[in-house]
């Protein structure tokens, strides 16, 4: 299976590493008996998803499939802190383990410090004591296969072909870039038997969380909970995904004029920009950037009338609920990473001249924004919003 790493240097390095691993593991593959995965009955399963929050959410349908296939197994999920907050009380998962992998493009938490290495070694030791029977890695990351599969002693290891990995795995699905991440995650599990599509991503909210977020909105606005509430999600972990702030301001103004209460969502790092975006606006326009936990944000979008934003985790969280979504795409491939919801309208142009598989930077920026996003006008977003009023759902 071909490696699907689109950075040429990384791809070349991976080919060399995979070739070396293939040689070293050849005797193991020859001498080892191939397990019958369709008859597997593991006592402990480790699900591995150390990506960003949108990736974890898009994998959640696979959680349902694993629980259905292995109802008596203890299922552990290894994810980051935000993933733990979202899925810590998930009935499909017995225990959530946390490790915040340092992703290089993030402004914070992007270095392997001595403390991070120490945490990693302690985690590997903990997992060795767990005696994991089955590791399921949904990212297809060679580093994760080695660290959390080989070094932890996981007896059976399955993943996809994104980074090769075949010599270290007992089963590997094809990483197909023409398919959505939800579908690819489910294909990883096909080695255990045919997979029924369990539907959309899902986040389980408690009975207390909905009334609590409604109360928070009422305290913010000083009024009863609004009948028309729009959530704006203008911020992403990568600047190349950003849509011009002035465009968002135009959309917010139009929503406000149409009687919507508008709330801008984001992290603490976005709070200053959010206040600047809404400053001087008339109507009921507010910011909760940096003022909500990820679970509060999930509750917030679940009670909204619509969510409008760029390619960000907020939209994937919104896809877990029956809320209309307007998703603004440009530098990333919507076929793979769009919000997986029948309520989602995807807006994008065909003007992207960069490598959408890398989506690291734009080589043709317009006023500091990616060209493909700068050419997508507010009028197109407002048209999609108007369509929502006529028909909130676009597909079953």
Q: Where do the protein language model's features map onto the residues?
A:
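Catalytic machinery of carbohydrate-active enzymes
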Residues: 1-396
